[in-house]
Amino acid sequence: MKTNFLIPGSQLDRMINYSDAEKIERRALGLPACEPAPGGLIKQLPKGRKVVSKKAITEPKVLNEAAEYGAAFVRGLRVDLPGGITQLLLSGTASVGPNGETLYPGDFRAQLWRTYHNLTGLLASEGATWHDIVRTTCYIRDIERDYGEFNSIRNEFFHALGLDPFPASTGIQARICRSDLLVEIEALAILVR
C-alpha cells in the first residue's frame, strides 16, 4: 500500500508516495514511516564527540547554487580538520552558467574549458588554486568519442598551470545529470593553513 503526502517548500513541493518497503526502511533510519520527516529529526552524534567544521563553497559570479534548480547538494564543501588542514570537496561541476543554464551544448571542448573555469572560481572563493588539487574524478558522457580531446585539453591546462605532478585522476563514462552536458569533474583539494 502506498501513502501520498505533499511536502510544501521550494525544493520539495511534490507528492511523496511511500511504498510499504520504503516505510520499513524509513522506520529503520528513525524517520516517520508515513509522513515527511521534519528537519533535524535524526541526531546521531555520539555524546562528547565534536562535529567537523563544514561550510558550503559558493561562487555566484561563476555558477549558481544547485538548490536553485531543485538539486539536493552544494557546489562544494570546505572541511576544516585539526592541525590547520582544510579539505575542499568540489561536487561534480560542469559547463553551467551563473543562472544555472547549460553553456555550449554540443561543444565538448568549450564545455570542458568552462568546467575548468567554474572549478577555478570555486577554488579561488576559498583561497585555493589548482596546485592544491590532489584528485579529480572526470565523468565523460561518450568516453570513446571525447577522451582524446579531454586528455589533450587537460594536459594543456595543467602544463599551463605548472602542475607537477598532476593530480591523481580517474576517468569514467557516465550519464551526466543533463542530456546536454558532455563532461563533469569532481575535485579534492587539501590546504595547510
Model-predicted segments: where are they?
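N-terminal presequence-like segments and the immediate start of the first folded domain
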Residues: 1-117, 121-134, 140-193
